[in-house]
Amino acid sequence: MGLLETVKDPRDLAKLSGTELEQLAGEIREFLITNVAATGGHLGPNLGVVELTLAVHRNFDSPRDSIVFDTGHQSYVHKLLTGRQDFTTLRQQGGLSGYPDRAESEHDIVESSHASSSLSWADGISRARQLTGEGDRFVVAVVGDGALTGGMAWEAINNIAADKRRRVVIVVNDNGRSYAPTVGGFADYLASLRPTIDSLRTTPAYERMLDWWKKKLQDGGPAGQFTYKSLHAMKKGIKDWWAPQGMFEDLGMKYIGPVDGHNLQAMEHALNTAKAYGGPVIVHAMTEKGHGYAPALANEADQFHAVGIIDPETGEPTEMSGARSWTSVFAEEIADIADERSDIVGITGAMLIPVGLHKFAERHPERVIDVGIAEQHALTSAAGMAFGGLHPVVAVYATFLNRAFDQLLMDVALHKAGVTIVLDRAGVTGPDGPSHHGMWDMAMVQIVPGLHLAAPRDATRLREELREAVAINDAPTVVRFSKGSVGSEIEAIDRLHDGVDILARRPDGSTENDVLIVSVGAMSELALDVATRLGAQGISSTVVDPRWVLPVRKSIIALAARHRLVICIEDGVRAGGVGSRIRQEMRAAGVDTALNEVGLPVEFLVHGSRSQVLERVGLTAQKITHDVVAQVLGTKVPFARPLPGQEHPTTGSLPTL
């Protein structure tokens, strides 16, 4: 039995010697490489926080002390140390979440895993502890250097620093290669001195002495005030030369570091010092993403930030998909458009490769801007670029557009800015769970005046609709597509005057059908399957792809009037979604055909594969067909319009309101 198997609770770490802790760190790395290689997941970040997480759990008493991870993908080691070592079904339906999950453990606090929020959580928890008489309990926020590019983190630091009584320890996990620690003899000498200096600067006696001299000098008239200002400036100059702490301490936070995040003894010393101070402290830990795993370190792109199923020895994928991804199609097309138009600029929020702007950046590096994890800034900056004569293309994951809704509404849409927003990972994404499903976007943008929304069904339509989007310069445009592989090409049998594609209708070409099926984006294949199944039941249908779901095309409303029932199949939430908007337009036009929204419930959907999640919520051809047949037969609401000579179905079985 290895040491890892003996750790059932963080308190078990206290029994281990320094040598045993080093052995445990090695076992954890081996465990992560073996298990994450088999399931996929965030391997590189977790290999980089092994010693850091061990030190945090050795020095703080979880769950009495709250540990918050920003972002939660770096919590695998935390899970292992808190009794969750069954990683065989990590990120799979019924298995462990890839992020902290309160349902799994009392040691988990924050589940959302959208970056830059942990310090606000720490601020709130520590305030609550003070007000409820539990101010002796610590809050530890483990935050990546990338998350500190988000403005929300600095808003929180500003508030945390204002109260010196709160026991907040912010551990900055700095694995950015552009912030690598200085090497060499002189740097090693400074590093050997730094623990002594940090110990002095974080003692209460040192703080009391500074406050006493400050008051004495400031009360000493002009001469004393001049002396204080001079000494304070000299102290600050020496401090800024000695360590990169000025940015934090200017905000009123004590700073310890930089510390080697892979040196357990150094990390424990730093955390002990921070703990003894008793007030807000930042511990700056320098780490290496993918530490201890050569294939990760050799990966220049992202050091195995997130991997699929790989060979643990080589790091090579074990399954090569021949299908093209939505992202790769976008990457090629936006780069080609940029070649043709010098006014096109790309904006990303710290995700150049994942959102497909890398080819654009390779060809035109001066026209691709990485703003960091700052979606709010990205949208307003884009509005400014549009005002200046450019056409920005902001590429983000669909779930992260939520963070910038006010900027979309008030900075982009209100000013009719020609900004194109490309939403990757729209709809159900699968293994990463509720905080990463891109299922809220369509309902959210429905209420933005003047916005145009496209949902391509295949690669050809993505290229086509992206070009149409960047041709609009007097309103915001949004193009959304799914995660993963693009399906087969689905050719239209007709395109109507306003751009709506007819994908299927009765063989004789008649539009007098029972059911109008409106398919949104990647749901077209499912919609065609439903139409085939309905045909086998003797129910005729027309299948349309609006291509541009906003504004609602008039031909959709005209077709709805000539059918007995409309169903809208979408991979966004039903409430306020595309179907809801079509219903409103139908009623405004006096069309009383019943409409059924077939989409996602307003729920936080737990992780699983995309197909498993869709099956759980009833977005399958079998379930949709079953419901539509019942609606046409008049046994399930909404009832299809009766045929001539038929009466409306009885509603005696319905509840009385």
Curated annotation (Swiss-Prot):
GO cellular component: cytosol
Subunit (UniProt): Homodimer.
Gene field: dxs
Protein name: 1-deoxy-D-xylulose-5-phosphate synthase
Organism in which the protein naturally occurs: Paenarthrobacter aurescens (strain TC1)
Residue numbers binding Mg(2+): 145, 175
Pfam families: DXP_synthase_N (PF13292), Transket_pyr (PF02779), Transketolase_C (PF02780)
Sequence positions that bind thiamine diphosphate: 73, 113-115, 146-147, 175, 293, 375
GO molecular function: 1-deoxy-D-xylulose-5-phosphate synthase activity; magnesium ion binding; thiamine pyrophosphate binding
Protein family according to the UniProt entry: Belongs to the transketolase family. DXPS subfamily.
Reactions accelerated catalytically: D-glyceraldehyde 3-phosphate + pyruvate + H(+) = 1-deoxy-D-xylulose 5-phosphate + CO2
Signal peptide, first to last residue: none
Keyword tRNA-binding among record annotations: no
Source organism phylogeny: Bacteria, Bacillati, Actinomycetota, Actinomycetes, Micrococcales
Any GO BP annotation: isopentenyl diphosphate biosynthetic process, methylerythritol 4-phosphate pathway
